[in-house]
Amino acid sequence: MSRNLAIVLIASTLMAPGIARATYIFDAFPKLGTFSNPIGVEDPMDGTDRLFIAERAGRIYVIRNDATVTSRTLFLDISALITTQTEGGLLGLAFHPNYENNRFFYVTYTAENPRREVLARYSADPSNPSVALPGSQLVILEIPKINLHHNGGRIAFGADGYLYWSLGEDGIAELAQDLTQWNGKLLRIDINNPSGGNNYGIPATNPFAGSGVHREIWAYGFRNPWRFSFDPPTGRIWLGDVGENSWEEINIIRKGRNYGWPRMEGKECFPPSTCDTTGLNIVLPLYVYEHFGSASITGGFVYRGPSNPSLVGKYIYADYVTGEVSALTWNGVNPPTNALLTVEPGIPSFGVDKNGELFIASFDGNIYRLFATATAVDTPAIAGALKIGPNPFGTSTHVAVSLTAPARVDLSVYDVAGRRVATLMNAQSAAGSHEVNWNGRDESGRTLASGVYFVRLNMNGQTVETRRITMIK
């Protein structure tokens, strides 16, 4: 994959000729090298201008938040405690609001024997803030599991100082509606004031009480609430819930409310027939989008940074399968509007730093940043057109590239995790049409599985077009 600027140009009829709306995704740390399945980017907000990168296999690295950084330090390795089978792994990382003084941070991960989701606290070394103490683990809460998917796993502190934890329904849909079960919920706990023999307390303002009910629950009715975030200026909690058959959801979370699964998927009954929602206190999603090749929302953040004025106040999120990164605009009153920004396959997570700048973790191993500006585009110099057909295809598909000027061309196929699986062209190429067939095989000649892939056209070190294709065998 190119480690340079990735560009998607979105035409604007309001701009003069030669000017286009451009959204740039670029490698935030081009001299650093790649990570292995980065699952999170977190700023400890301790005044040190550092970022912590969590890898799914259980390692956390610390780096300087500087585009010129060339090295990383291993902060913590708990890979021996973790299973990465199916959707398992190190899933969440959060720093205590008073981390600068107490050095506490929290992780969530999937473990076996017995199978469970674990929320645990660790401490950084007081004499070396770039190294954690592996022996400092304090298990806060463990959630029994039957399956290894629909885990959720995001943890984050709210402005109220409480810790929130999103949990999927473990592939057992009915658990999401059962308040005596943890699964399919957003929890809210007090880690500063333990009580009741636990390593945490329950805030007095939590909404649920009663025999057998888990008082830790803040909201419920989720399928797989993989990522959520807080928007401090508004106090809203934004949550992306991964759908089943038809719809991906963006929800605004309210105290004690039911978000519908499995009675509803998106704004429709599930399955699509009549359903009785009487007395269920259901809140419909703020926004939904149909699958049509999309299949797994990655919830993001409302952008509040200084670098992209055109994105301020917009909710930035992605679809893991299509790679589409989008901006949702909502003023709290009118229906939301959505705009595609760019494409980057295999995005599991977003992060923000102390300035509100947005980072994008990709399973290609890179950490990206996003820029959206009005930029003069010299289209005749490197303009290219990418055509693919048939799409979907069975045994082979035809790929054509048209260049209006000579360019260094890298035309490659990527899977949904962002891994390059086939190189179709990689050469200095003359102006004109260049054509190639792809037979659905990787670079070693093995036939790939049916599914969604991406053909990416790089010219002169810039990604100028990415097209989704579907192989059906």
Task: Identify the role of each PLM range.
Residues 6-16:
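Bacterial N-terminal signal peptides
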Residues 21-174, 227-230, 235-243, 293-331, ...:
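Acidic, Gly/Ser/Thr-rich repeat motifs that build Ca2+-stabilized beta-propeller blades
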Residues 28-30, 70-79, 130-142, 198-207, ...:
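Beta-propeller fold detector
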Residues 161, 414-421, 453:
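Short, glycine-anchored, charge-dense loop/turn motifs used at functional sites
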Residues 428-431, 435-437, 443-473:
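C-terminal tail/sorting-segment detector
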